[in-house]
C-alpha cells in the first residue's frame, strides 16, 4: 500500500516542519529521497554557521559580502535545491527518465555540492573570527555541511554513468574533483586542532 505524502510537492521543503519532512522521508512514496535530505542537511549546516556569524565580527567577509549574508543565501538555495531534487526524483519515478532528466539528476547534486562548498568557505571564515562556545556550533555546522557535500558528490558520481553525453560527464566529473579539493582544504583549515 502506498502511503500518501503529508504535504504535496508544491509545498516547499522550507515550509515543512521537521517532523513532517522526516515522516515523508521514511514513507514508501518517493520523493523525498536521499538527495532531498542531503540538501536539507546542508541547509541545517548553513544555519548553524549563519547563527555563529551573527555572534562573530560583523566584518567577516567572503567574496565581497558578509559571511552571514552568504550563509543565509546558501541556506535558502539549499532548500530550493531540496525541492528541485524532489521534482527530479518524481519525474524519474514517473518514467520520464530521458537524457535531460538524467542530466538534471546530476546537475541538482552538483548544485548542492557547490552550495555546500560556499557554506564551507564562509563557515571556515566564521570559525576564524568567532570565539567562545559558539565556535562549536559553527564547527558542527561544518561537519553537517561536509556530510551533505560528500553525499551530494556520491549521488552525482552514482548518476554520472547514466548519461550518454561524454563531454557533459567529463566536465561534471572534473568540477566535482575541483570542488572536493576546495572543500577538503576549507574543512581542514576550519577544524584544525578540533577533536572529532
Give a label for each model feature.
Residues 1-196:
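Acidic, polar-rich N-terminal leader regions of halophilic archaeal proteins
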